[in-house]
Each structure stands twice: as structure tokens, then as C-alpha cells.
């Protein structure tokens, strides 16, 4: 397929760590598919920067969760978005790629599209789960959608939105058979004996809301299973600092906190207690029994409940189309309930075998060589623009 011979400029925005991961994968594919040099710039995180991305703003300025929590950051986010749009319209890159962060990116994408700059969005918003009215905004803003999940293109096609199913980069990255023994050696954990990975989130608000409940659940589990060990990844020194008071309050826990390495920590585990989010898909790809939980402020929870369509929030259940792992949310997420459910996941060997089959099928479906497939879709959009010019 022909491509422009002059230097390309691609603007991109990722708004949170999961988007940084996806965008870095896409950048790796683009660097192989597109001619060098191509200038990639905009807003991104550490993984994107490691791929040669030129980030003009700090990604964490856009990282918020929930309606109530976002209110204090709205002025700063609007300022950054305004500056970004002015820059795009002045410099006119060959395309704009928004990676997730739909509430931020759709506005930018519509401005780019209205100005004749192709707009590509990576990660279809979960319009099939809640806020389905966003499909109208997508149709106005997006020239081409890169979809992580196989059922999404059919939904978009009905609204006249071009799309490509590219799979999920985590499915390419994670082996079909996880090396639990090797992960335990890497973390200095005993080869034998039960291990539970606990992931309470990475944001201050998440730790404040669910951290104490998770630690109380761990204490109950330790009482019932004295030989039980826990592993908890802390992505940053700041997160470790947030967790330290909870660690100090539970000195009896056989707990190992790792510096990052969340995937290794989950691989080492026999079961996982995890806050809802992309990490639940990672746990499924690692074939681990899990309990999914979250707590958000009351108002945020009410809005989410009223705008939701599905009875589940965890990606493993959404992709399976049924409850394959338990979810304990909001006031149902008590220490007792979390401890009971997690120990059941740990002990039930028949359930473990069933989950391995379900998660392996899921893994194979999502393993699509995402970086190359997404890069090829971007190249097609760029080529279409060249032919129209």
C-alpha cells in the first residue's frame, strides 16, 4: 500500500495508564509500518515516551475517575484541551489518534475532523454496557474506530462508523500458559503454599475508598488460612506511600509489596482480589480465579447504575456474556463477603478448571497481533487521505 514519502506527523492523546499501554503498543506497530522519520506527539505517558513519543503535556493531568472526583480538575483539563485543539488546527498533522479517554478525546477528534484532519479513536467506548447515546458523538467525531473486542464493529456499523477489530495487545503479550513457578521465584515467594494477589487500584481516591476494606478482608482470610501469603503490586513510590499506613495497621499479614510488576504478581498468585478495570482482563488472560470489586462515591455510583445496561462490570464477565467470576460492588463489598468469595475462588478446583477453559478461549479470540493490525488500519486511513488530496 503506498504511503506519503514526506515526513508524517501524527498527534496522539492517551489520558491514563491503560491508554498509555495501548498507545505504546500502537506506536510500536506504527514505527514498523510507517516510513521513518514520523513525528509522534501530543499527550502520553512513560510507555509512549519510551517509544519515541513527544509528550507536550503530562498525561496524569487528564487522569480522573468518576463524576464527583473530576469536578476539581475540570478547569485544568479544559485549558489543556483548548491549547491542544489550537495546536492541532495550526500545525495540521496527518491524523489525530485519540486513545481511550473518550470524554476528552471526542471533542478534540470532532475539531480535527471538522478541519479535515482524519480522526482515529483507539478503544471503542463501552456503549454496549452504558451511555449508549454516545454513539451519536462517535459518528460525528470519529473517522475510524480501532476496536479491542470482536462484537464492537457490528454495533458501530449500524451507526455508519468505519471500524477495525484489532484485538487486545495484552492477549499478544501474555503467554497462553502462565509460569506461576517462575513468577514466584522472581518475587522471592515460596514455591508451595497458597498465594493471593490483591490489587486495590492505583489512584489516591481508589485506595481511600476500598483500601481499608481490602486489607480487612485480607486479615480475615489470614485468620482462616494461616499459611496464606499475599502479594500486592505498588506501581509507583507514591502508591506505596499511600498503602503504607494500611500495611502498618495489619502487621500480622504475610504480605509482599512489589515495586510495580503487577503482571508478575498476578502470575504468582493462585487467586486474585482486584478492583474493577483493565487489570481484570489481564487476570483473565493469566487464567486466574478472581473476585472483582469496587467502591465509588455514592453519587457516582447512582449515576453509573442508572446509565448501565449490563448486570456486570468486570471485563471477564462482559466478554463471557455471563457471570464467570463474582463481583462485589459498593455496599456489597464488605470484608466478610470479599474474604468468603476470594477463599472460595482459591479452594474450588473444579471452578478453576472451568475458568481456565473459558479464559483460554477468550485469550485466543483476543490474540490478533494488535500492534500490526492497528498500524495497518491507521496506514489505510492515511493512504485514503493522500488519495483524496
Curated annotation (Swiss-Prot):
Report the superkingdom from the record: Bacteria
List, alphabetically, the InterPro entries matched.
Glyco_trans_19
Listed under catalytic activity are: a lipid X + a UDP-2-N,3-O-bis[(3R)-3-hydroxyacyl]-alpha-D-glucosamine = a lipid A disaccharide + UDP + H(+)
Give a Gene Ontology cellular component term annotated to this protein. Answer: membrane
**Is Transferase included in the keywords of this UniProt record?**
yes
Give the EC number(s) under which this enzyme is classified. Answer: 2.4.1.182
What Gene Ontology biological process does one annotation of this record name? lipid A biosynthetic process
Biological role: Condensation of UDP-2,3-diacylglucosamine and 2,3-diacylglucosamine-1-phosphate to form lipid A disaccharide, a precursor of lipid A, a phosphorylated glycolipid that anchors the lipopolysaccharide to the outer membrane of the cell.
Record-given protein name: Lipid-A-disaccharide synthase
Amino acid at each position: 500500500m503506498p504511503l506519503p514519502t514526506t515526513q508524517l506527523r501524527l498527534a496522539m492523546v492517551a489520558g491514563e495508564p491503560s491508554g498509555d499501554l495501548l498507545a505504546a503498543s500502537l506506536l510500536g506497530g506504527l514505527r514498523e509500518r510507517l516510513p521513518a522519520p514520523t513525528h509522534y506527539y501530543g499527550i502520553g505517558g512513560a510507555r509512549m515516551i519510551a517509544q519515541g513519543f513527544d509528550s507536550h503535556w503530562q498525561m496524569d493531568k487528564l487522569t480522573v475517575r468518576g463524576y464527583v472526583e473530576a469536578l476539581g480538575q475540570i478547569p485544568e483539563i479544559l485549558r489543556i484541551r483548548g491549547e491542544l485543539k489550537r495546536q492541532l488546527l495550526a500545525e495540521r498533522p496527518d491524523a489525530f489518534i485519540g486513545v481511550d479517554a473518550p470524554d476528552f478525546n471526542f471533542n478534540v477528534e470532532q475539531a480535527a475532523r471538522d478541519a479535515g484532519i482524519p480522526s482515529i479513536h483507539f478503544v471503542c467506548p463501552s456503549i454496549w454496557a452504558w451511555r449508549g447515546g454516545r454513539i451519536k458523538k462517535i459518528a460525528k467525531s470519529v473517522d475510524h474506530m480501532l476496536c479491542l473486542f470482536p462484537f464492537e464493529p457490528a454495533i458501530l456499523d449500524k451507526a455508519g462508523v468505519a471500524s477495525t477489530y484489532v484485538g487486545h495487545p495484552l492477549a499478544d503479550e501474555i503467554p497462553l500458559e502462565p509460569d506461576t513457578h517462575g513468577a514466584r521465584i522472581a518475587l522471592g515467594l515460596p514455591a508451595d503454599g497458597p498465594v493471593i494477589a490483591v490489587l486495590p487500584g492505583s489512584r489516591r481516591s481508589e485506595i481511600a475508598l476500598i483500601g481499608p476494606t481490602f486489607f480487612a478482608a485480607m486479615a480475615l482470610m489470614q485468620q482462616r488460612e494461616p499459611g496464606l501469603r499475599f502479594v500486592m503490586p505498588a506501581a509507583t513510590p507514591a502508591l506505596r506511600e499511600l498503602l503504607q499506613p494500611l500495611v502498618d495497621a495489619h502487621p500480622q499479614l504475610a504480605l509482599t509489596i512489589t515495586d510495580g510488576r503487577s503482571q508478575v504478581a498476578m502470575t504468582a498468585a493462585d487467586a486474585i482480589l482486584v478492583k474493577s478495570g483493565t487489570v481484570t482482563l489481564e487476570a483473565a488472560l493469566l487464567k486466574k480465579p478472581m473476585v472483582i470489586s469496587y467502591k465509588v462515591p455514592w453519587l457516582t455510583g447512582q449515576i453509573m447504575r442508572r446509565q448501565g445496561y449490563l448486570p456486570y462490570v468486570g471485563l471477564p464477565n462482559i466478554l463471557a456474556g455471563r457471570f464467570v467470576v463474582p463481583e462485589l460492588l459498593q455496599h456489597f463489598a464488605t470484608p466478610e463477603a470479599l474474604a468468603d468469595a476470594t477463599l472460595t475462588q482459591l479452594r474450588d478446583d473444579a471452578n478453576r478448571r472451568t475458568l481456565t477453559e473459558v479464559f483460554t478461549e477468550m485469550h485466543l479470540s483476543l490474540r490478533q497481533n494488535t500492534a500490526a493490525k492497528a498500524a495497518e488500519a491507521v496506514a489505510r486511513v492515511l493512504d485514503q487521505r493522500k488519495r483524496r488530496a
